[in-house]
């Protein structure tokens, strides 16, 4: 089961917190709250609880950046266990919508991050493998529909060395599991056949599974490094999980389409009855086109809006989500619960309002409403025992824990909560520049928070203009890029990081000695008590930690933050004095996030493959052709490209297109 790997033992009030949490879980407590200050080792406490309880665990975070940090830390604590990452795989996502006031229809537009898609599949595969030593770090993506776990499990291909297996049946099974055959370029989610060998680049892993046949018998099962082609490991049996989370059971397709057509007829009749023939015509054309695509290709754009039919669910029932892939006795840890819980509450309402317009005006069938996130009540119904973790828990968490919370105020390093100073807003940027230069001289880092994305970018540009090595992050900065920027801050490539609300909960940056909060007296969402306390906590991992609140008045939130910080400081000072502890800096190794390493590896492999293809073009026979010969070859290449696209072999079509464009460039140069 779980094997905790840590170079240190629980200290301070960690042992008592671990004991209380473990006792609470074993006694059947439905919910507990861990009130732990920044830097007190809440993640280490949770890791100890997981290792003692030995249950599959879901750790829920409210944004991708913090989820990535938790993923990195948990991988270090549990190197021999399955630590997985499940967040939204969209780099960009514009949902389908209709705005009645301007009669504007917005089509769905998206960009999928293949690496995060692989990690999501890896999480699903680990849960369905039957392993109990699984920790999944997730964002609110775990609330959204991802397909029936039974269909996903049935699409799994089980292989056993020495058993009879017809190769043709295996290839058909791979296609049904959404793998694509490509004998030229073997990339993630594809397979190739060479003689008696089938190579499958697993969609959820970074290696190739080689299946060797001797007649109709499986003679070997090996994993291969895709770059070096070296054998990594041999197996007696192996399970191949599908290449996509959304698996359609062929047996359910006919019944699903019959039900869709029935609901379509009812909806068309409804629109005619209320005197809206335009909406009736619109929904009829759209759904019939989608049905033709599904029957011909097995999918259509926006197929998720028909998920209820293919899942076999009744109207109004919750979609299958990540939680359905866990066993019933899962443990749920909600990190920074004061933010995450309200976020879970908000997911359903926003989605419903958008879907209602699409249904009301004839763009989607009513079943589209069932492709949605869980309501909070549904989420609670699917979760097991829960631990809420926060430095500033809200009333809801305390109520669920029956008013009892577990304090964790003492840091193992003896570090105190930072001193807080209030300064006027006049010339706040000039004053900030002086403070930054003092920290830069000591090789310390600075975090600055503003109240708007535009101000973040403008301040970053201003600091750079005066020679400060600055960077900024906000919601429009790509997930993996945010992680990279924070790593670069720790390494000293930047001295200052400017942000809005991303510089709050959970960010672990021990080199930061100063947190500056601009416009701290602007009472509101980003300047309430919890936001100020969480932001101030970013300076609590440094012995010289200090917080400057720039404001012309002291708001109730500012006063509460200062009072609570002073209360904690007094307790921490008393504990240090009693035990003879001298506060010491947290020497945390700067280790690259595994997500960054995976991203770099993927980029290197892609670049190497592209270079190999381009090198082959340099020595291609057409490079020696005269103009007439090249024109003929170019036209032949163009036809081959169109034929490949017609056959839906888009990888081959793209490769042919790139070579054809080179031919066209050479033809233009000849003129």
Regions found by a protein language model. Name each.
Residues 26-33, 55-56, 132-134, 444-445:
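Pre-Walker A (Motif I) flank of P-loop NTPase domains
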Residues 54-76, 82-91, 451-454:
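Conserved Walker A/P-loop ATP-binding site and its immediately adjacent core
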Residues 1-35:
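Conserved pre-motif I regulatory segment
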Residues 457, 477-500:
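Conserved helicase ATPase core of P-loop NTP-dependent helicases/translocases
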Residues 27-49:
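Walker A/P-loop
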